[in-house]
Amino acid sequence: MPASGMLFANDHDAGRTFIFDLRDPLHPKIVTSFTEMAGYLHPHSYLRLPNDHVLATFQHEHYGASEEPMGSTGGPVEIDDQGKVIRSASNADPAFAGALLTPYSLVVLPELDRVVSTNSSMHLDYIFAGVTYQVWRLYDFKLLKTAYFDVGENRYAQISPEETRLGPDGSIFVQTLGCGLERITGVNTDEPRSRLVYTFPGNWCGVPTIGGHYLVQSAGAMHGLIVLDITNAAKPVEVS
């Protein structure tokens, strides 16, 4: 629970986010709700920043009633606990005009002044179209880099990059819907890199958890969980 007692809860399909005041847990109340923020729609992931504001990934730009309602790009939006927009940025990148750029998850690295976000769609028509990640400067939301994920031997494990997790060594692990585990390094350099370091069985993997030097991943193909030892982050080892 955030120290402020304010909880953001998202109904993604409806595109509406609710902010709950839980400072009195037995008498919760809704402070406000929102759909569009700073010209963006359909938020997906939320993280607390060091200043206690919330940074959210919005999947689509809102074009307005006279045009197509949702754009093919979105962006990060910083929001306070009252639902006020603090700042925002577009993740559009002219060098990747043909790529799907709908922000999905993100990880914040305050000590490096960086944010890393993934691009993956929640819409079934485009659910297997995402293959990129983006690196931002935290203090002003400047987009520094858009890059493709590493492609493995099976040619699909990099598809639909979803959840970002900060590893114990400071690198970033990304689970994909294609059941790959990508590792991003060098985000504070001009040339960040991703490497496919593990491939789980099947596909439709989601929502990994890191505890200590272990990464736990659900694997639908085996109806169970796989635990990796990521002490050597470049070469995870299955231990359970």
Language-model regions, residue ranges each:
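Short loop/turn segments immediately following beta-strands, especially the blade-tip
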Residues: 19-28, 78-86, 135-144, 183-192, ...
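Conserved beta-propeller blade signature
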Residues: 6-9, 54-55, 114-116, 171-174, ...
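Beta-rich, blade/repeat-based domains predominating
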Residues: 1-3, 37-50, 95-114, 151-171, ...
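Short, solvent-exposed loop/turn segments at conserved positions within beta-propeller repeat blades
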Residues: 12-15, 64-73, 124-130, 157, ...
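Beta-propeller domains
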Residues: 1, 9-30
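Beta-propeller fold detector
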Residues: 29-36, 86-93, 143-150, 193-200, ...
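Loop/turn-rich, solvent-exposed surfaces of beta-rich toroidal or solenoidal domains
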Residues: 203-240
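Asp-box/WD-like beta-propeller blade repeats and closely related beta-sheet repeat scaffolds
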Residues: 22-110
